[in-house]
């Protein structure tokens, strides 16, 4: 069975766990509608992505 040669220091353990934290998602304001949306995602209400109509407009 494999056994570590040295004890992992608290500093190294913390550096390894630094990527485990949950980050809040970032939002960008849509230029056309002014709604908040995720960057690099299309707007589901208008169906636009990068100035092009990708989906049909959602009826409300």
UniProtKB/Swiss-Prot annotation:
InterPro entries per the UniProt record, alphabetical: Ribosomal_bL32, Ribosomal_bL32_bact, Ribosomal_zn-bd
Gene Ontology biological process terms, A to Z: translation
Compositional bias (Basic and acidic residues): 28-44
Recorded superkingdom: Bacteria
Keyword presence, Ribosomal protein: yes
Database matches in Pfam families: Ribosomal_L32p (PF01783)
Keywords: Ribonucleoprotein, Ribosomal protein
Region (Disordered) residue spans: 1-60
Record GO terms (molecular function): structural constituent of ribosome
Protein name: Large ribosomal subunit protein bL32
Organism from which the protein derives: Rhodopseudomonas palustris (strain BisB18)
